[in-house]
């Protein structure tokens, strides 16, 4: 049975992005943090905690095979979903990258949405339907977090209430830190070897949540523990409990007058795919119907540190949560569409990557 592991930062956290540390060159680009952290970071903390509970002591040989906790590249029996964010005890979701608008000084939102536009010929091909604004307003594509109720409104092609919209700076802040290099053997600070980087300081009520399954019930942590998490020697408190948050409900899918079911698929977690270009144009694999348009966020980068070989991991691109594709399908594909909601598509799905939820969209003439 899967359990919810909830990580609460004890101080700042550091989950390094792909930016290299300076080697004497000029410039103000600092190594930053990816937040929420990628599962490659979370799985290391979780697997280590599980192994320690079974009596394993860290050594250079890695985890014993008998524990069946896998490796960084193959999780064995372990099954993970997430990471998700929880704020004030409520799970949050990345808003689909279809919301567009602005917020005035009083805190009121003016919103519209992206929908597929008319066919055009462009560098992507002939007859491409690029996304357009449903209503012309000032603003920008919104990078927000939403509650379950807010997500259900968006999936139903409605606008969420303001109380269900949370901006990132309400959840965490970036904080610049200064460090100094030390000699590996003596631990003595090296003169003129200062470095700067960006940490994350989460709100006191913010937690990072991972669903952990595929292991015996009594392997889960039984009490609150402090575990190393991320880089720079940072720690987080971990609580394990039953999973209490089902996914946002899928809206009712209907067949339009022209015989088409119009639906969207949105990434809840980063997506990793072998053929990224094809996925951008045609949508994630194994989705019924035809992709007619998409709103995709800026690519993320997955890297990290290879502890076994003591070197950085190769940087690989990911599609960010919130990326949304617009699909059309035939009426007889209804059951297949329903099966997409909450499923994982693409590569590294055992790591929680590529989780999708289904919504609906309408042509302008359907309103």
Name the predicted role of every residue range:
Residues 1-367:
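Conserved active-site/ligand-binding neighborhood in enzyme cores
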């Amino acid at each position: 049975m899967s359990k919810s592991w909830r990580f609460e930062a004890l101080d700042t956290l550091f989950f390094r992005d792909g930016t290299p540390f300076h080697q004497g060159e000029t410039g103000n680009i600092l190594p930053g943090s990816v937040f929420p952290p990628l599962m490659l970071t979370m799985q290391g903390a979780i697997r280590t905690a599980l192994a320690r509970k079974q009596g394993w002591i860290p050594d250079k040989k890695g985890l014993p095979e008998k524990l069946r906790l896998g490796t960084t590249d193959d999780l064995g029996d372990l099954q993970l979903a997430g990471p998700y964010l929880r704020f004030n005890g409520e799970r949050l979701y990345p808003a689909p990258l279809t919301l567009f608008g602005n917020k005035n000084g009083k805190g009121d939102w003016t919103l519209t949405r992206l929908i597929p536009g008319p066919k055009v010929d462009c560098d992507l091909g002939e007859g491409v339907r690029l996304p357009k604004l449903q209503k012309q307003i000032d603003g920008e594509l919104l990078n927000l977090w939403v509650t379950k109720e807010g997500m259900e409104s968006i999936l139903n092609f409605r606008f969420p209430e303001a109380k269900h919209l949370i901006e990132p700076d309400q959840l965490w802040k970036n904080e610049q830190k200064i460090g100094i290099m030390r000699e590996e053997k003596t631990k003595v600070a090296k003169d003129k070897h200062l470095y700067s980087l960006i940490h994350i300081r989460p709100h006191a009520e913010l937690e990072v949540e991972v669903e952990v399954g595929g292991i015996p019930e009594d392997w889960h942590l039984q009490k609150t523990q402090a575990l190393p998490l991320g880089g720079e020697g940072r720690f987080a408190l971990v609580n394990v409990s039953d999973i209490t948050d089902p996914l946002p409900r899928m809206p009712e899918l209907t067949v339009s007058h022209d015989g088409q079911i119009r639906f969207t698929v949105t990434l809840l977690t980063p997506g990793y795919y072998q053929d990224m270009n094809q996925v951008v144009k045609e949508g994630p694999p194994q989705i019924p119907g035809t992709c007619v348009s998409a709103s995709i966020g800026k690519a993320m980068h997955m890297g990290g540190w290879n502890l076994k070989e003591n070197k950085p991991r190769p940087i690989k691109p990911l599609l960010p949560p919130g990326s949304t594709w617009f699909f059309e399908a035939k009426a007889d594909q209804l059951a297949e569409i329903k099966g997409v909601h909450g499923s994982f598509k693409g590569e590294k799905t055992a790591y929680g990557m590529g989780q999708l939820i289904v919504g609906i969209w309408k042509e302008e003439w359907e309103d």
